[in-house]
Swiss-Prot record:
Pathway connected to this protein: Protein degradation; proteasomal Pup-dependent pathway; Protein modification; protein pupylation
Family according to the record: Belongs to the Pup ligase/Pup deamidase family. Pup-conjugating enzyme subfamily.
Residues reported in the UniProt entry to bind ATP: R76, T89, W451
GO molecular function per UniProt: ATP binding; ligase activity, forming carbon-nitrogen bonds; magnesium ion binding; ubiquitin-like protein transferase activity
Catalyzed chemical reaction(s): ATP + [prokaryotic ubiquitin-like protein]-L-glutamate + [protein]-L-lysine = ADP + phosphate + N(6)-([prokaryotic ubiquitin-like protein]-gamma-L-glutamyl)-[protein]-L-lysine
Protein name: Pup--protein ligase
Keyword entries, A-Z: ATP-binding, Ligase, Magnesium, Metal-binding, Nucleotide-binding, Ubl conjugation pathway
Organism: Bifidobacterium longum (strain NCC 2705)
Organism lineage string: Bacteria, Bacillati, Actinomycetota, Actinomycetes, Bifidobacteriales
Length: 486
């Protein structure tokens, strides 16, 4: 993964102690990194995907002299390995804000693709069409990711996260999976067949479900950045919001239990074989009551385990409700729990059609089932094309038609997304990064940035360190940096 500079924070030390509200409370930083797939159809001769990606990023290179840059909304935009355009959202305090920033990434990628498409047609014919897929597996079977980031308190050991959180992450795919049509049938997740380890610091030699590489992008003595790899890329706004929201509540319960030396209620949920459990969950529709083996020797279904997590979190909320309510600026705990309860009830009843307006895999299953009823002779290749259209944010029509017919719920309006394209969250350090990047671009200054540093490289070198991701107020170093810029 390309870096503008070394963004590790192990060598940095906070000049002031971390505020107790951040360490003792439940506030959190959320972020989503999405890798996109790129393809071209209708060209008069073959076009390499790498060439397409570079054409998309030509305006970025012209402006920033790099394919790796930060934007005025505080996000990061870059080309990942394998010519996959990637967008990493600015730091957000609330799942709803993180969703807005993620949708802003779709908007940015779509605009880059359509501009590149016009240029490509000059050389490859009037029908050359660029497709940008927000999914996780291409037609050749190569997998790429959607990674969630959660700031967690460092006093929680990684072993605790592995044993208590991973079973939740695996089974939450019942309502956050994007679904995938395979030659062997329909799976509710996209990446289960590609993830081979539970936790690891590697991302290329192996494919872990949770990455343990220690890059907190915050005070390293107080926080770690939990880098979740197991999740799918979602088109559904509800699914993106939901996976962040419910994971936050489970993390709060784990952190508080360890903080006070009491049980979280999740201690006995570790899987004997997480990879095997993940593959079983992905094939949920083959046998919704399939049992997963825990380390204790007990067996439980995926839905049964989600019920247990729900009950434990509900009990936790009864004693910590006020503190939890203050942790999220825009999302209520009652809303999260209500949505969680309703989706589990629908899964229990097998009412998958009732989930098609919010759960990606359910929406796609309904589409495939309807197609097979109308055309019993439909081929796998045709269904695969339908699925790709669902995930195509540049020229796809299927997902947009579902939204237009009110068959897919939207949590945010187009105006919300347009605002997030141009503006960072106002209550994290992204506000400062966005302000600096916007000003530097406006005056044509030479600068560099990463998650914790802002640097003016010419005409004079100045740097500001933003170690606290919760802090949106300008530091003295930031004010001096802006003075030098102006």
């Amino acid at each position: 993964m390309p870096q503008l500079r070394d963004s590790g924070t192990r060598s940095l030390h906070a000049t002031e102690p971390v505020p107790s509200a951040e360490m003792d409370g439940f506030c959190r930083i959320f972020g989503v990194e999405t890798e996109y797939g790129v393809a071209v159809t209708g060209a008069e001769r073959p076009v390499d995907a790498g060439q397409v990606a570079m054409t998309m990023f030509q305006p970025i290179v012209s402006r920033s002299r790099s394919t790796n840059t930060y934007l005025a909304n505080g996000s990061r935009l870059y080309l990942d390995v394998g010519s996959h355009p990637e967008y990493a959202t600015a730091e957000a305090r609330d799942p709803r804000e993180a969703l807005a920033q993620d949708l802003a990434g779709e908007h940015v990628m779509r605009n880059l693709a359509l501009k590149a498409q016009r240029k490509l047609r000059e050389s490859y014919g009037a029908h050359a069409t660029i497709h940008v897929f927000k999914n996780n597996v291409d037609s050749a079977g190569h997998a790429f990711g959607c990674h969630e980031n959660y700031l967690v308190r460092r006093f929680v050991p990684l072993e605790t996260i592995e044993h208590q959180l991973l079973p939740f992450l695996i089974t939450r795919q019942l309502y956050t999976g994007a679904g995938r049509m395979t030659p062997d049938g329909f799976q509710i997740t996209q990446r289960a067949d590609f993830l081979d380890e539970a936790v690891s610091s590697a991302t290329t030699r192996s494919r872990p479900m949770v990455n343990t590489r220690d890059e907190p992008h915050a005070d390293p003595d107080s926080f770690r950045r939990l880098h979740v790899i197991i999740g799918d890329s979602n088109r559904s706004q509800w699914s993106t919001w939901m996976k962040l929201a419910v994971t936050h509540l489970v993390l709060c319960a784990i952190e508080d239990a360890f903080r006070h030396g009491v049980p979280s209620g999740f201690e006995q949920y570790a899987f004997a074989d997480p990879a095997a459990a993940n593959r079983t969950v992905s094939r949920f529709l083959d046998n919704p009551r399939a049992e997963l083996t825990l380390e204790s020797g007990e067996s439980v279904s995926a839905l049964g385990l989600q019920r247990r997590y729900y009950a434990a979190v509900k009990a936790f909320i009864e004693t910590h409700g006020d503190a939890l309510a203050g942790s999220l600026p825009a999302t209520t705990i009652d809303t999260i729990m209500g949505e969680w309860s309703r989706v589990l009830d629908a899964l229990e009843r097998g009412a998958y059609d009732a989930l098609a307006d919010r759960v990606d895999w359910a929406a796609k299953k309904c589409l495939f089932d309807a197609l097979k009823r109308r055309r019993p002779d439909v081929t796998f290749a045709q269904m695969e094309q339908l699925e790709l259209d669902y995930h195509d944010i540049a020229n796809g029509r299927l997902y947009g038609s579902l939204v237009a017919r009110n068959q897919m719920r939207e949590l945010l309006t187009g105006d919300n997304v347009e605002y997030a394209v141009h503006n960072p969250p106002t209550d994290t350090r992204a506000a400062l990064r966005g302000r600096f990047v916007d000003a530097a671009l406006n005056v044509g200054a030479q600068f560099s940035a990463d998650w914790t540093h802002l640097t003016l490289t010419a005409p004079e070198r100045r740097e500001a360190i933003l170690l606290d991701p919760f802090e949106a107020e300008p530091t003295l170093g930031f004010e001096q940096l802006m003075e030098a810029l102006n």
